């Protein structure tokens, strides 16, 4: 609570490559917003994700626009360009620094997949990150939230720095969506309708000259 009893604004931060954004991302963000009483969830598409340099990543502007399309119908969802406009490799520490500067009085909650937490102590400036935001680890299909690698990471973190929750188990991944698009298989109901249409219009995830069937 802020001085005078006024409740602090609670801001969720969902960073990701979003290549493409899919319904699993949206369900996870909605579930976290409900459970933690968030006022807003800001989606932050990465510029150049440092951990995915081994594969080609769709252009940042395309990923940004797909995220805008996907989140437009939910009044609690917004999209930020901080990682894209910064340039260079994207690190979570920079995302949180920028959003803290833009929202100095808000409580920040960083939303990530539970599987990413196994290596969280190797992230750049992880101590600083936990001083800026609380972390919410959400389950992904086939992943055990109480795995020993997660427990080991949590043992090194400050109290109340990290929460683990389960979300409806939608077996959707961006990788599968890309593969289906490459093979001209439908991606309806895996991603929002507007994203299906954007992928087809921009001929994403296909070799040059090959059409895409939504």
From Swiss-Prot:
Domain of life: Bacteria
Pfam families tied to this protein: CTP_transf_like
Keywords tagged on the record: ATP-binding, NAD, Nucleotide-binding, Nucleotidyltransferase, Pyridine nucleotide biosynthesis, Transferase
Any single GO BP term: NAD biosynthetic process
Keyword ATP-binding recorded: yes
GO molecular function, one term: ATP binding
SUPFAM superfamilies in the record: Nucleotidylyl transferase (SSF52374)
Pathway(s): Cofactor biosynthesis; NAD(+) biosynthesis; deamido-NAD(+) from nicotinate D-ribonucleotide: step 1/1
Catalysed reaction equations from the record: nicotinate beta-D-ribonucleotide + ATP + H(+) = deamido-NAD(+) + diphosphate
Gene3D superfamilies: HUPs
Record bears the keyword Hydrolase: no
CDD domains recorded: NMNAT (cd02165)
EC number(s) from the headed UniProt entry: 2.7.7.18
Task performed by this protein: Catalyzes the reversible adenylation of nicotinate mononucleotide (NaMN) to nicotinic acid adenine dinucleotide (NaAD).
Membership in a protein family: Belongs to the NadD family.
Identification of the protein by name: Probable nicotinate-nucleotide adenylyltransferase
